[in-house]
Amino acid sequence: MQPPGGDAPAGCPFSGARAAQPAQAAHEAPHVPGEADAQAGWHNAQLDFSKSMSYGDYLSLNSILDAQHPLSPDHNEMLFIIQHQTSELWMKLALFELRGALDAVRTDALPPAFKMLARVSRILEQLVQAWNVLSTMTPSEYSAMRPYLGQSSGFQSYQYRQLEFLLGNKNAQMLQPHAHRPDILEQVRATLEAPSFYDEVVRLLARRGFPIAAERLERDWTQPTRHDETVEAAWLEVYRHPQQHWELYEMAEELVDLEDAFRQWRFRHVTTVERIIGFKQGTGGTSGAPYLRKMLDVVLFPELWHVRTTL
């Protein structure tokens, strides 16, 4: 707000343009672009990128936009490809943020971890919304292109598998789909054999003085997360006295937010599959929708959900 008797408004603080005087605004003709504008650039924007990096260069758009290669003549296959490619990009970012948060937890730097966990939850919301686009594909449209997919399936996504492992849903059998790619197999195996994000949070509870069972702190990391009474007792204390354990309280809620979003992603996945292929077998050999429905029962952070009943 301009104080009485002050100077005229300075105009836009971002573009640097000054506001027009009332007389100018009332009597001057609107500006018509001419030759001088063409030489200077539209609104002083840089137009020649022959000697500097452009938007497309920075984002490697040629590589990204040339990565769609439909195998069928069907129009709808482009949607199918881009849906899955963009999901893989979001998963790449989710893994990047989750690993950053894990490193922060290991060093007790919790505020940065909260920021990264919140971002992962927002990424999962993007993935949930993406199913709305794919659900515009009808069963007849999918049937026209399905024979061209062969045995390829989202079940084989190595980034998704690492995300599951990092969140604690471990299963050594899920290494097998990647055995033909030793470089990828090494990445997925390393995630399987390392502590999950929640394992590191449980270690954090121990560092903060909670009596966590020794067998929970040093367990077989290749096994899925199991409910532990000492971990639930720690979370119960945190929830009963949040002001005394505020960082841990915030961590607990960030994890619940994350799993909530992850469950919604899974639910939208199975609903979209049922909508498009019903209960047919999946291209990767699974039972399709029934397999995905079983995944809805997986609980990533069991004590954080059970403690709500105990409180």
UniProtKB/Swiss-Prot annotation:
Cofactor binding, note field: Binds 1 heme group per subunit.
Residues bound to heme: H269
Span list, region Disordered: 1-37
Biased composition (Low complexity): 17-27
Gene Ontology process terms (BP): L-tryptophan catabolic process to acetyl-CoA; L-tryptophan catabolic process to kynurenine
Cofactor requirements of the protein: heme
Family: Belongs to the tryptophan 2,3-dioxygenase family.
Protein name listed in UniProt: Tryptophan 2,3-dioxygenase
Gene source species: Burkholderia orbicola (strain MC0-3)
Top-level taxonomy: Bacteria, Pseudomonadati, Pseudomonadota, Betaproteobacteria, Burkholderiales
Gene, per the UniProt record: kynA
